[in-house]
Amino acid sequence: MDYLSLIKQPIEADLADFVDLFNKSLMHSDGLLSQVLDHIRQRAGKRMRPMLILLMARNFGKVSSVTQHSAVGLELLHTASLVHDDVVDESGERRGQASVNATYNNKVAVLVGDYILSTALLHVSYSHSEKIVRYLAELGRTLSNGEILQLNSISNEEISEEIYYEVINQKTAALFEACAGIGALSANASAVEVTAAKRFGQNLGIIFQIRDDIFDYYDSKEIGKPTGNDMTEGKLTLPVIYALKSTGDEEMMKLARKVKSREISSEEIAQLVAFTKENGGIEYADKRMWDFHAEAMNFLDTYVEDRDVYNALKAYLDFVIERKA
């Protein structure tokens, strides 16, 4: 059985209910709004975030209407943030499909993103849980702050792992942490259990982001972006940060500063990518992923008793670290 089938096995019916509720949340009778929401609904991914929420609820109790509305609220918040991110990044594509701003325009994208965000707040209010409502509100602030922090880190000449992890913890890791935490909260898990679930989600998110960053050092049609795309956008990720710090190569450090100032050529990016590969950057990033994987496994061994849920969460963890796209 493949990873995704294992992940879905304990929550198959719950996931179908989530998809139905999520799709209904993105329906509207207005002509233009209906068109844009249909466009967004068609680009559904693997449902990794809602599956984590459902699995955590199943682990600590049961999947309830509180769980489902919380899952829809969180996924809508994430969807709204992606619509807005595409405007900020002037991106023309999202998951192999034309972005909302490219298909329509920036005004429509911003307004529809706001509409989806409001719908997210509506759904999470149906949970009638002050803790979950507060958590989602805090997540929205954290994700926005993470984007601003990343913009600031690009213009800042300092290059360090600390800054790299600080950005991740307010972006990808924060999202996965919230999924695990909200799933546990929806099943009335104890404070200790919720904290442990959040840490598991954070580890998952860090692994997910490091894997994404490693992809950027290789060409892949499946991934849908060329080698060095992050550097083109002014971002220095873990593999190159390690290679620079471990060698102290001043010539390469000059190129790294050109990445941050957006003055680097494609030929120089190719040099920096090759330098990273030759100096253990990929191997180091891979090792760090497995360090976080080991910590995440401690959560499974301590807090997950149901064998099907254990297998599903382990498959989830293994999928994130071993995925090819």
Where are the regions a protein language model picked out?
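All-alpha prenyltransferase/terpene-synthase fold signal
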Residues: 1-325
